[in-house]
Structure formats: structure tokens, C-alpha cells
Amino acid sequence: MVTQSYKPWLHHVVVSGTLHIYLSQTDRGELVCGNGIDTYPHYGMRSTLGFLESYAAHVLELFPVLHNVAVQRQWAGLCDMTPDYSPIISQIDEIDGFYVNGGWGTYGFKASPASGYNTAQMVANRKTPEMIEPFRYNRFAENRLVGEKAAASVGS
């Protein structure tokens, strides 16, 4: 969700793994906030009042001063999650020259620079950089899941 503009006061991204929310403030003063994922898989693309009310209650737990903030808009979308809540950044061994960088789920854009750089290195050199080795596609078949679910912060 996005609020109306307020004088900038929040100079950091705030993430709560307990409340499954994150928020930051833009240079224009809007609060941009995100929430957890639905507890059941579906392909709905509509925001709901219930989702907004739940999210607002969690934001107020952290920042009671925001009780009169006006919401300008909210949105919904698909969240591409993997079983371990971590992305897949990998060459697919069975298909020569096929690479995947997806399944980011709730990580959003936070890791885009490092992900893009390492994916480019992998494609150019045809070798997986050490930094992204844990995110190989084959980790699921090998039962070597990435143990960083908390980093997603807004998982179920």
C-alpha cells in the first residue's frame, strides 16, 4: 500500500519478520508498505479490505503514530515462491544454455544488483559464481534447501 505524502521521517527500511511486514518512505514522503502472502495458494489479483485492515493493524503495532495516515492505493499480485522461500538462480543442466533467475517471492528488488551481476557472470563464463551456488535449481532434488526463510520476512 502507499500512503499520502508526509514530511520525511523514516530514513530506513523497516522489516518485521514477526509481523510479516516491511515499510519505507519515498523521497516524496509516501510510505510504501508491503505485507505477507496469503496462507493458501491461488491466482487472485485483487486487493481486499480484509488484507488492508490486517496490514494496517500490524503497521500500527510498530508505529502507533500512524493511526490517521491516509492510504492512497494498494495492489495485489502473484508471488512466485519456492519451497524454501529462496530464489532459483541457476543454469538448468538438462537444457544447454538455459538459465533461470526467478522465484524471488517476497525478497522483491532488494537483491537485484547482486543477482543481476552474478547471473551475468554465470551466463558469460558458463560457471556458477560461489555467491549464488546455494540457489541452484538442483538443490530441491538434492534436499539442500537454503535455510534463510527469515530473510524473506513476509512468508507465511
What are these language model-derived features?
Residues T18, L60-S156:
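C-terminal catalytic lobe of FAD-dependent flavoproteins
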